[in-house]
Amino acid sequence: MHPLRKLREAGKPTLAQISELLAENIVFNSPILARPLQGRELIAPIFTQSSQTRGSGTYTAEFKLDERTTFLRWVGTMDGHKFESMEIIVDNEQGLITERTIALRPYPALKLFRDAMYAALKDKLPPDVWEYPAPSLNEGTLQAGATQELVGNL
């Protein structure tokens, strides 16, 4: 059993307990954040909060993909909505987590989870992790004249 799963199944883990499992340079990829995050000090509070936020449920699957990579599936409910997470965890030679990538479904439950996490962590994380920046005109947004030209060519 992966140490993160074992810790979460034992109850609500503390920040210190979560921190002990993480490599200093851990990378976290989550659909509730606009970009990957890196570093134990930034990520440990997120993992701790998510254990308290995500509601009741159980791990239903665990597979070792190779000697350092684990797949976990968790199913539960949050505010009465079915909630499912799938994650891939990569550990280093010392058994510390170096990368964690999560997928969450369905969308309504993901949104509830994201909103709850935002409320709990908005002042603890940089603002740019919550929203994608608005595209500039140079990044693919069409100007009015270009739109008219495209429509005229159809």
What residue ranges belong to the model's regions?
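C-terminal and inter-domain tail/linker signature
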Residues: 1-154
